[in-house]
Amino acid sequence: VGWQWDVPRTAEQTRIGLTPPMVPLAARTPKTQMQLRIQPNKLEQCFALTDHHVGNLGHHTPICPLDPDDDGAQLLVRRTKYESPEKIERGKWKFVRAVGDHPISEHSHIWLKGGFKPGLIYDILFTPKDCPVVGAGMLATRDCTSFLRYEVASPFNGRVDHVIGEGQSQCGRFLRTFLHLGLNSDQKGRPAFDGVLAHIAGGRRGEFNHRYGQPSVQPTPSFGHLFPFGDLPQFDPLTGRTAGLLDRHRKSRNLPKIFYTDTSAEYWRGDAGLCHTELASGDDAN
């Protein structure tokens, strides 16, 4: 199932993806912006307006601005992740593409006078032209699974005993978000998956059901790093909330059997330890 809306759709690189419904401009209330992060490895005059954390492996669909001349758009820069950003003057950058040192009118890119410098962290805040229903990918996954499992018209009709959902890394985080939203029950109340294997997903989720969501985004700050982390209810000392990843499914049933598998990388940066830790004390969760 193609569930991600912004996968490459070029002649050179085409992947199975989702063509989602779009939210009309009049329905996008209140008016909001999206954040797009750029962390250059070398001096560059311009970048495509898309996720760059996987470099040339990505080539995600560019996200063009609604108004290329919007004075409310911002370009921020900082030297380290947690320091306060500096705002770059609006007259020093444009939503255009550069050929050499010359900007041309193509609004799928951002151009900065003097270039984007390596080692710095840039954040672009702007209102996109299009607003895909990003979460439709989760419903497509559930409904396709349900169709193949239960419907008479399914090519596998009568031959399905169990269905296992397996995902690695981003797809594992997709499955964790799927469970957190309580989506394992189809429209007739039947379970889509009997089991879920989320591999190297750590304790995170992702931008899979948000306005202007970028499903491949990993770096902080991002929706994927938000509480809750563990399956069972935890107390979060920062927000004062008590919640668990599977709270919705514990109420609605159809909870699949779940396996999480992680490597040391997920403990260093994937927040995996938060899945089985008391957040206030650091002790093992009960």
Label every model-predicted segment.
Residues 1-286:
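C-terminal His-loop and adjacent cap/lid subdomain of alpha/beta-hydrolase
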